[in-house]
Amino acid sequence: MIQYPEPLAKLIESYTKLPGIGQKTATRLAFYTLSMQEDDVTNFAKSLLSAKRDLHNCSICGNITEDDPCPICRDKTRDHSQILVVEQSQDVMAMERMHEYHGLYHVLHGVISPVAGTGPEDINITSLLKRLKKDDEVKEIIIATNASSDGELTAGYLAKLIKPAGIKVTRLAHGLSVGADIDYADEMTLFKAVQGRTEM
């Protein structure tokens, strides 16, 4: 087995902690980092630290933001009667690229997953329920969890919790292929999924 110098081995190990990055890709990234100009490496490191230090979750919707509440929650021109529930912050970015949805969001930061041992208490559901109790302006919850088994399980669980409150609960149309992540979908697919949403 190749013995890399300790600083290089630690850099490779750090890259392997990123999702989807295996040993081979991590090694390639580490060697590329070593070939970069020192100023570029410094700026890269500063960007990582700045993002970790300055970004946090919005206290209302859970989306990543610098300010609290986030710009979307503060925007009075948006439709406050609709909340679109997504798994991750990158799903919000995907929906915003579409420029067709003008309501609010709620980020779960995960899904209910029996296999992974993730229960309802492990994701951002309680804050959604509290939000709905405080805000009688909300008329529709659009559930936009991914079209995976865990996404469907989470959608069903949310619908059972929310519908008794008299709030309309809808699900994105199945234009998204099974197992597909929302943040990988193109704008037209997302537009059709929102427009064709069905009541649960």
UniProtKB/Swiss-Prot annotation:
Pfam family of the protein (one)? RecR_ZnF
Q: Which residues form the Toprim domain?
A: 81-177
Superkingdom in the source lineage: Bacteria
Its keywords, alphabetically, are: DNA damage, DNA recombination, DNA repair, Metal-binding, Zinc, Zinc-finger
Gene3D superfamilies cross-referenced by the UniProt entry:
3.30.60.80, 3.40.1360.10, 6.10.250.240, RecR Domain 1 (1.10.8.420)
Where are the bilayer-spanning segments?
none
Q: Which GO terms describe its molecular function?
A: DNA binding; zinc ion binding
Where in the chain are the C4-type zinc fingers? 58-73
GO terms (BP aspect):
DNA recombination; DNA repair
Family (UniProt): Belongs to the RecR family.
What job does the chain carry out?
Answer: May play a role in DNA repair. It seems to be involved in an RecBC-independent recombinational process of DNA repair. It may act with RecF and RecO.
Name of the protein described by the UniProt record: Recombination protein RecR
